[in-house]
């Protein structure tokens, strides 16, 4: 694979190497793919028989899921690291990246599902249960004088940040027309401004706090975003797509990880499938607040 493409997912590849070095082993057990959401949900079976699960956005609304994903059947029940090696031959599409990332999160499940293990690794880590999620409490990170940049508009978090911050600047890959609001008569004053993604360098370089969607991991923009935002006081990555062991994230410059952790139960998998991936209000979903070690 060309070097420039390898660079895209170095973060996930390095994370998988870290997990391998930690002695974490398992086989690919099951994969669920949805076009709504859209999500790739992977399950691995650890060598001790317990199950780990991990999810990643596959951006099906912008990049089509392959018509034929039957090749994944040939990967089931294989050693997870053999699966990852075989995926190298399938290119570096967003879908393949989402599969690789979801596998990395599934491999990370034992570490991420037990904050005591993360604390042993030297991280500050807390667990939160909906609706009391740290993602929905920007006062933990944002001050009234701050300029907040958000990589990706979030329908809940963007206005919450706007209630506190001096200014909220959003960069988006989607057509900005889709985020426009038509106001007739009374117009709301707003400290939120939305820009196309090609303005990212200009916007992120001004920010005190940066919220980064985990989707940037699968679309290959995460390293560029971290470079553009290197002057920020706090950089936060959030969501189910960034639910993997955070060592490499922190080494690259992320300060806070807010991953969503799904239950590994058959009941959750069934509800996920029947709802076509609408996990947002499902019971037993939790969020971690992990801060990188300052030592």
Model-identified regions with their sequence ranges:
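Short, conserved loop/helix-junction motifs that constitute active-site signature segments
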Residues: 161-165, 205, 227-232
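Electropositive, gly/pro-rich neighborhoods at or near active sites that engage anionic ligands
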Residues: 2-164, 293-294
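NAD(P)-binding Rossmann-fold cofactor-contacting core
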Residues: 168-186
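Short acidic low-complexity segments
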Residues: 194-205
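C-terminal functional extensions of proteins
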Residues: 234-295
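Structural motif
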Residues: 147, 208-209
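A short acidic, amphipathic alpha-helical/loop segment
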Residues: 157-161, 221-228, 248
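Alpha-helix C-terminal capping/helix-to-coil transition sites in glycosyltransferase folds
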Residues: 144, 205-206
